Amino acid sequence: MHLRRVRTMPRHSQSLTMAPYSSVSLVEQLEDRILCHEKTTAALVEHAFRIKDDIVSSLQKMQNKGGGDRLARLFLEEHIRNITAIVKQLNRDIEVLQEQIRARDNISYGTNSALKTLEMRQLSGLGDLRGRVARCDASIARLSAEHKTTYEGLQHLNKEQQAAKLILETKIKDAEGQISQLLNRVDLSISEQSTKLKMSHRDSNHQLQLLDTKFKGTVEELSNQILSARSWLQQEQERIEKELLQKIDHLSLIVKENSGASERDMEKKLTQMSARLDKIEESQRRNAEGQRKPEEEKVHGRISKLELQMTEDMKEMKAEVNAGFTAIYESIGSLRQVLEAKMKLDRDQLQKQIQQMQKPESSM
């Protein structure tokens, strides 16, 4: 007797392709063991029937031959033992199979419940996925609309950026032209100031040379006047000495002519003459010293006046040169400050325009 079991899958496993791997493998193992037990029981039953057939045939032969009771009894006992053993084995196998069937039913119930829960989860997941897909479609449509608007805005911003770039380039060119003009003006002013400085330096040098020549001329004139005064004094002294010598000679002649006069009168006259000569010499010396002192004082006064005038002229020229230098430095400093302020303003304007252009780019 052959027993045959067909392996069937549950409905949920047929409807759903996914199941827990551990439960499926355990069910398959149980089914394999049941098939193996069925095969063994079928083999034992076949073996018992074969023994039965052998016994029946042997009994028939013994009955035909006669005197086979004892042997038949032995065969029957052997057959009964075999059958009881087979029945016991079958009972044990049936119990094992029942337990395995109960375990398989429990496992199949668990797998069915798990599959049902999985199916419910999958259905809920599918509904959730459908809702998500619908929401994704709506968000995709919204994003496509936003993308379109942003693309149009980007194109508009690109056009504005190009226009602003052109305006900024023109402004930069204008600023560069203004800066170049200012630099040219500064160069011209610096060259003019340098030429003025050179001219003032030349004029100051020329005036100093003129003052030097004037001072030298006055010194030479004073020295000539001093020399002329000294020569006049020497001439006057020589003239007075000649007059005195002439008078002395005249007196000596008179003395020789009047040798007959008394010695007292001669002595008196000589003393008077010597006194007169002394007085004349003192007066002449006083007159010469008096004339020399005012002339020397005049010369010293003129020299001091010339020195004071020259020092005052030098101070005035130095003050004028310093004033010119300070005015030039002040004008250069003011020009530099104006240029730096203008360049700073232009730089700030350019930086503001660049930042204004960079803001839409960063937002883009």
Swiss-Prot record:
Region annotation (Disordered) maps to 275-301
Q: Which domain of life is it from?
A: Eukaryota
CC annotations in GO:
cytoplasm; glutamatergic synapse; postsynaptic density; postsynaptic density, intracellular component
Where in this chain does the entry annotate a coiled-coil region? 80-107
Where does it reside?
Answer: Postsynaptic density; Cytoplasm
State one molecular function term (GO): molecular condensate scaffold activity
Where is the chain membrane-spanning?
A: none
- Where is the sequence biased in composition, kind Basic and acidic residues? 275-300
User: What are the UniProt keywords, alphabetically?
Assistant: Coiled coil, Cytoplasm, Synapse
The reply on keyword Nucleotidyltransferase is no
Q: List the disulfide bonds.
A: none
What coarse category fits the chief subcellular location reported for this protein? other
Q: In which tissues is it expressed?
A: Highly expressed in brain (at protein level).
* Role according to the record: Facilitates the interaction and assembly of proteins within the postsynaptic density by promoting the condensation of postsynaptic proteins via liquid-liquid phase separation. Required for neuronal activity. Accumulation at the postsynaptic density results in enlargement of dendritic spines.
The annotated subunit structure for this chain is:
Interacts with DLG4/PSD-95, GRIN2B/GLUN2B and SYNGAP1; the interactions facilitate condensate formation.
The similarity annotation says: Belongs to the FAM81 family.
Q: What is this protein called?
A: Protein FAM81A
Q: What is the lineage of its organism?
A: Eukaryota, Metazoa, Chordata, Craniata, Vertebrata
What gene codes for this chain? Fam81a
